[in-house]
A protein has these predicted regions:
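Surface-exposed, flexible coil segments in extracellular/virion-facing regions
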Residues: 1, 69-93, 164-189
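Extracellular recognition modules
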Residues: 5-11, 100-106, 161, 196-202
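Short, solvent-exposed loop/turn segments at the edges of extracellular beta-sandwich modules
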Residues: 11-17, 106-112, 202-209
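Interdomain boundary/hinge segments at the C-termini of tandem beta-sandwich modules
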Residues: 24-30, 119-125, 216-222
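Proline-enriched interdomain boundary motifs that mark the N-terminal boundary
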Residues: 30-37, 125-132, 223-229
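Short, solvent-exposed loop/linker segments at the N-terminal edge
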Residues: 41-48, 136-143, 234-238
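A short beta-strand segment in extracellular, disulfide-stabilized domains
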Residues: 47-57, 142-152
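Solvent-exposed loop segments of extracellular immunoglobulin-like
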Residues: 58-69, 153-164
Length: 238
């Protein structure tokens, strides 16, 4: 590594003449290295993934880039991404699954190509909150079974908010103060009628939509009454 200067001296023995060439300068640089590697991400379907980016130092000339995609965690050079020839790349997230990305960087001046680390972009389905046992009928002054959900898909940490509603729909309800767990108990219901509840689940992962459950319905009915009572006493023959 360094700067080196060369010239040649030409002698003509017969005439005794001598001439020097001009000086030629050769600069030998450090080999190129990648200082910033691409970083993968977990993301919900159709979200905006983190931009993959590389930065380099050393080498000769202007670097050229080619990004590659693979379904395996290997340096598979058989699938270059068309048009992906910059130092950054925005991966697609329109298909569920794992895609591995890396970039090959080329330089001038006889420098060897270098490859980035492999970055995994894991695209998962949107979250779905499914109501468990969504329809119940109880007697007045009774208490419904605890509402629970099955949450599948999505990425990140969930937060919960339960709502009550006056109609059989999972929009436009009233948030229930303090009802921020993944389950909910109504407490004792002392009014006859039909009551509606649902939950909204928010995930802090990249690109995840709000997950809203189906409606939980509780039908509160009057306690049963006996229309015909047994005869209180009878006399019969032996």
């Amino acid at each position: 590594v360094g700067t080196f200067f060369y010239y040649v001296v030409i002698n003509q023995t017969a005439s005794g003449c001598e001439v020097n060439s001009e000086v030629s300068t050769i600069i030998i640089n450090e080999g190129p290295t990648i200082t910033t590697q691409p970083i993968g991400s977990d993301i919900c379907l159709d979200g905006t993934a983190n931009t993959l980016e590389v930065l380099t130092q050393n080498g000769v000339g202007t670097p050229t880039y080619q990004w590659y995609a693979s379904t395996t965690n290997t340096y598979d050079l058989t699938n270059p991404i068309a048009g992906a020839t910059n130092s950054t790349y925005d991966p697609a997230t329109d298909t569920v699954g794992e895609i591995f990305y890396f970039v090959v960087i080329s330089f001038e001046g006889g420098c060897s190509d270098i490859q980035s680390e492999i970055a995994l972009v894991n695209t998962v389905p949107e979250p779905i909150a499914t109501a468990v046992n969504p329809e119940q009928t109880i007697c007045i002054d009774g208490q419904a079974d605890t509402f629970t959900i099955d949450l599948v898909g999505g990425i990140g940490n969930p937060t919960y908010q339960w709502f009550s509603n006056t109609t059989n729909t999972n929009t436009g309800g009233t948030a229930i103060a303090g009802a921020t767990n993944n389950n909910y108990d109504t407490g004792v219901l002392s009014t006859i009628g039909v009551f509606y509840y649902y939950i909204e689940v928010t995930l802090d992962g990249i690109g995840c939509d709000l997950a809203i459950s189906d409606v939980f319905t509780v039908n509160v009915v009057q306690d049963p009454v006996i229309d015909t009572q047994p005869i209180d006493s009878q006399e019969i023959c032996q």
